């Protein structure tokens, strides 16, 4: 797998996270998830996601149970 294979479109990243592309777009606009904004091409800038960033973001959002078995 090349380094470019680790660059995901919105649809690919959404599939990896098992959420809709619209949900991922909302998270991105609210800056809740890391993304890469390429230089503008005309009126818009292509958005991509790095697989490593997505996986790290997932690790950071694991909710661990406390001693009583309830979410902390």
List PLM regions with ranges.
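A residue-level structural signature of the nucleotidyltransferase/glycosyltransferase Rossmann-like core
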Residues: 5, 46-47
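Short Lys/Arg-enriched helix C-cap and helix-to-coil transition segments
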Residues: 36-46
């Amino acid at each position: 797998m090349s380094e470019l294979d680790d660059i995901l479109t919105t649809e690919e990243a959404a599939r990896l996270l098992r959420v809709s592309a619209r949900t991922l777009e909302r998270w991105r606009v609210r800056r809740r998830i890391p993304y890469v904004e390429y230089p503008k091409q005309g009126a818009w800038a292509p958005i991509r996601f790095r697989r490593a960033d997505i996986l790290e973001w997932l690790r950071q959002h694991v909710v661990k149970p406390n001693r009583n078995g309830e979410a902390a």
